[in-house]
């Protein structure tokens, strides 16, 4: 069982993410972003930085926690705001996205590796954000997924176990969210999560068109 630290960026989605992780067999400790004990990070098998309002600079210790994960090589997954924080840690610029999206679906195309292993491309995902990483600025990270209009939807570090997704894997609007999280749990030392994710799906049906 992977022992996870979930950094809560004061967001209502965090407990849905935790429910997904626990359903896949992991244990999760949820801590608000302003009370994170950075020294304890290496005692966890993985760290998830949750969605939340505002910018990475206003996300408490999230940026510092990601830096600590990089230093200790602790697997880290950033979701939405957490993804943006990961981009900023490695030199990326986060600015206003071309359009604000809240509860909208988009089709993304991904590289089929890491978080996206075993998932079809194109893939339908649920988006809730007004900011995005500028693609030309994330030179220290590999862009793993984009929308058809070029918005960065996924990144990973080329050498460290650090991943980010701009969309919400836990949303019912996202196809294959359980498998994405299971892929990350496998990197955290819990490969049996892949079997636990089998057959689990969102509550609605999808076609390949963005809403």
Question: Language model features by range: what are they?
Answer:
Residues 8-9:
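Acidic di-acidic motifs
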Residues 27-33:
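Short hydrophobic/Thr-rich beta-strand motif most characteristic of the beta2 strand and flanking loop
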Residues 172-211:
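Acyltransferase
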Residues 112-159:
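Catalytic beta-strand/loop cores that center a nucleophilic Ser/Cys/Thr
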Residues 18-27:
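Two-component/phosphorelay signaling modules centered on CheY-like receiver
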Residues 35-44:
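Short amphipathic alpha-helix with an adjacent loop that forms part of the alpha/beta core around
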Residues 1-5:
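Extreme N-terminal starter segment of soluble prokaryotic enzymes
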Residues 43-117, 122, 181:
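Cysteine-nucleophile active-site neighborhood
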């Amino acid at each position: 069982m992977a022992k996870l630290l979930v950094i809560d960026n004061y967001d209502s989605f965090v407990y849905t993410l935790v429910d997904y992780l626990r359903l896949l067999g992991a244990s999760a400790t949820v801590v608000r972003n302003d009370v994170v004990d950075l020294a304890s990070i290496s005692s966890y098998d993985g760290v998830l930085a949750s969605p939340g309002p505002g910018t990475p600079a206003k996300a408490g210790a999230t940026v510092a926690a990601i830096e600590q994960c990089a230093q200790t090589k602790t697997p880290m997954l950033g979701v939405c705001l957490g993804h943006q924080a990961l981009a900023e840690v490695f030199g990326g610029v986060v600015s206003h996205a071309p359009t604000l999206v809240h509860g909208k679906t988009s089709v993304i195309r991904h590289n089929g590796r890491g978080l996206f292993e075993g998932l079809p491309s194109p893939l339908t995902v649920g988006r809730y954000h007004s900011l995005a990483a500028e693609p030309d600025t994330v030179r220290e990270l590999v862009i793993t997924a984009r929308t058809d209009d070029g918005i960065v939807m996924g990144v990973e570090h080329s050498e460290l176990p650090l991943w980010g997704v701009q969309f919400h894997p836990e949303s019912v609007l996202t196809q294959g969210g359980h498998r994405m999280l299971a892929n990350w749990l496998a990197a955290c030392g819990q490969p049996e999560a892949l079997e636990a994710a089998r057959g689990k799906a969102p509550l609605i049906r999808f076609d390949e068109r963005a809403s």
